[in-house]
Amino acid sequence: MALARTERQELEQTQGVVFNVQRMSMHDGPGVRTNVFLKGCPLRCGWCANPESQQMQPELMLRAGQCIDCGQFAESCTACMPAWQAARRRSAIQFEAIDDRIHLCPTGALNWVGEWRTAGDVMAQVRRDHPFYGDGGGLTLTGGEPTLQPAFCAALLRLAKAAGIATAMETCGHTQWDIFAALLPLLDVLLFDVKQLDPVRHLEHTGLDNALILENLRHAVATGATVRVRVPLIPGFNATPEDVMTLVEFVQTLPGPVQAIDLLPYHTLGKAKYAALGREYPWQEQPRLSLQQVEELAAIVASRGIAVTVGG
């Protein structure tokens, strides 16, 4: 996909809010991936592993375990934690003075998460991994929900295509269809999260019902796009054999095949991030699934003739 010089320059100047670029990943798409994490998400899943992705704006995080009470920056000291948490609830604009002093934190306990970056800047980082992609690897847009920043997504994907880099995007599915329709031709793989088919339970535990999500999944499959359905296996929410069979039966009603179903076992790696954001972890933990239980759920998917992976 060749780009004219002026078109490339315009794409490279497109801006978005990025909170992480994970290089050399073996997850979130085939082969070796460079995962670009974008801020902003319409859902509020209780088990979210990346709570720092939910708000669109950059946020302050304080990792108390790294704080050494140096006194160089009062807001970073655990002795001042109550005052910091109160300040944390104010808008990011009121942190402008703090932004100038964050470098004083000697351990990195206090830091901003999320920054405005240009597509050209991000792609310069992505291209460093290009030699390792081989036949299957490439760029994955994730988050957060990438489609909340559609112009930035389109710029990154078009620049990647122009560089001969394969593309993928993970989505929660809750966005306007015309945004999906514009991005799908730029994607080699769409990683589509399906968390729960029951609309009431979906609303209760994510903050939104699933009608638009499932409608968009049907539309995406109908276009002939390569779609992988991704399911976070959350004990107490969607991780029983009955839940998985219901999902499989739904997938078989779609207007075309999916490439695979990826089962993603629940973990608590995001729990410390809630504390760093001054928020309580909202999910009431239950015993994790054993390896045998996960394998049994995968076998249910395979028994209906659908390719399945564990871990994504």
Stretch-by-stretch model annotation:
Residues 62, 203-209, 278-286:
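Short glycine-enriched, charge-decorated loop/helix-capping segments at active-site entrances
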Residues 1-30, 233-312:
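Auxiliary Fe-S-binding modules of radical SAM enzymes
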Residues 21, 51, 64, 108, ...:
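Fold-independent oxyanion-binding glycine-rich loops
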Residues 120-276:
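Conserved AdoMet/S-adenosylmethionine-binding subsite of the radical SAM
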Residues 1-74, 83-84, 310:
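Flexible, acidic/Gly-rich N-terminal and inter-domain linker regions that tether
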Residues 46-53, 71-93, 99-115:
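Iron-sulfur cluster-binding cysteine motifs and their immediate structural context
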Residues 61-66, 86, 90-99, 116-127:
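Short cysteine/histidine-rich metal-coordination sites, predominantly Zn2+-binding motifs
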